[in-house]
Amino acid sequence: MNIVEVRHPLVQHKIGLLRDASLSTKGFRELVTELGTLLAYEATANLETESHTQPGWAGPVNVQRIAGAKITLVPILRAGLGMLPGVLALIPTARVSVVGLQRDEETLQPVPYFERLTGRLEERDALILDPMLATGGTLIATIDMLKRAGARRIKGIFLVAAPEGLKALEAVHPDVEVYTAAIDDHLNDKGYILPGLGDAGDRIFGTRVE
């Protein structure tokens, strides 16, 4: 499985700022947006292009354009929505597919409660957006959903990832590429990433308990 930990100095600087527990909701949200743009830039570096001839100021000119159907972004509710503006700033023509999952309290497995996917997934690159890759359960369920709908080229973009989640993903979907700003140490007994970011959804939307 292709796992890319983006070591660009700007990415590392910004993920360090995100780890500050005293950071305001506004500051956290802005950094998530910025990191979404930077990580999406890395994740789209190997998109296929095709030649196209268009009018230029001095006559016809041959240029490169992204081949195939437009990319679809797949934010996982709710925290994934925080990354969406930054990625759309880079890829404004992208389609957006939205997925929501919640944990079944008896089986502890993720269960979809919302699914709105764009069409022609078999022709598109799908970029899953989620700040945290922890156990991998939600991500794996999302990939299962996308593949059932026809998606064949899937990448995941995360701010931080846990080794346990990466291992779980590789066991069932080794074809999926992962891009992250940081691979953290481990999960604690409650499934939180350490050192992590805390609850990214609460910090993005300002719903954490003060």
Swiss-Prot record:
<dbReference type="InterPro" id="IPR034332">
    <property type="entry name" value="Upp_B"/>
</dbReference>
<feature type="binding site">
    <location>
        <position position="193"/>
    </location>
    <ligand>
        <name>uracil</name>
    </ligand>
</feature>
<comment type="pathway">
    <text>Pyrimidine metabolism; UMP biosynthesis via salvage pathway; UMP from uracil: step 1/1.</text>
</comment>
<feature type="binding site">
    <location>
        <position position="103"/>
    </location>
    <ligand>
        <name>5-phospho-alpha-D-ribose 1-diphosphate</name>
    </ligand>
</feature>
<comment type="similarity">
    <text>Belongs to the UPRTase family.</text>
</comment>
<dbReference type="InterPro" id="IPR000836">
    <property type="entry name" value="PRibTrfase_dom"/>
</dbReference>
<feature type="binding site">
    <location>
        <begin position="130"/>
        <end position="138"/>
    </location>
    <ligand>
        <name>5-phospho-alpha-D-ribose 1-diphosphate</name>
    </ligand>
</feature>
<dbReference type="InterPro" id="IPR029057">
    <property type="entry name" value="PRTase-like"/>
</dbReference>
<keyword id="KW-0021">Allosteric enzyme</keyword>
<keyword id="KW-0808">Transferase</keyword>
<dbReference type="GO" id="GO:0004845">
    <property type="term" value="F:uracil phosphoribosyltransferase activity"/>
</dbReference>
<dbReference type="GO" id="GO:0005525">
    <property type="term" value="F:GTP binding"/>
</dbReference>
<dbReference type="InterPro" id="IPR050054">
    <property type="entry name" value="UPRTase/APRTase"/>
</dbReference>
<feature type="binding site">
    <location>
        <position position="78"/>
    </location>
    <ligand>
        <name>5-phospho-alpha-D-ribose 1-diphosphate</name>
    </ligand>
</feature>
<dbReference type="Pfam" id="PF14681">
    <property type="entry name" value="UPRTase"/>
</dbReference>
<protein>
    <recommendedName>
        <fullName>Uracil phosphoribosyltransferase</fullName>
        <ecNumber>2.4.2.9</ecNumber>
    </recommendedName>
</protein>
<keyword id="KW-0342">GTP-binding</keyword>
<dbReference type="GO" id="GO:0006223">
    <property type="term" value="P:uracil salvage"/>
</dbReference>
<dbReference type="InterPro" id="IPR005765">
    <property type="entry name" value="Ura_phspho_trans"/>
</dbReference>
<keyword id="KW-0460">Magnesium</keyword>
<comment type="function">
    <text>Catalyzes the conversion of uracil and 5-phospho-alpha-D-ribose 1-diphosphate (PRPP) to UMP and diphosphate.</text>
</comment>
<dbReference type="GO" id="GO:0044206">
    <property type="term" value="P:UMP salvage"/>
</dbReference>
<feature type="binding site">
    <location>
        <begin position="198"/>
        <end position="200"/>
    </location>
    <ligand>
        <name>uracil</name>
    </ligand>
</feature>
<feature type="binding site">
    <location>
        <position position="199"/>
    </location>
    <ligand>
        <name>5-phospho-alpha-D-ribose 1-diphosphate</name>
    </ligand>
</feature>
<keyword id="KW-0328">Glycosyltransferase</keyword>
<keyword id="KW-0547">Nucleotide-binding</keyword>
<dbReference type="GO" id="GO:0000287">
    <property type="term" value="F:magnesium ion binding"/>
</dbReference>
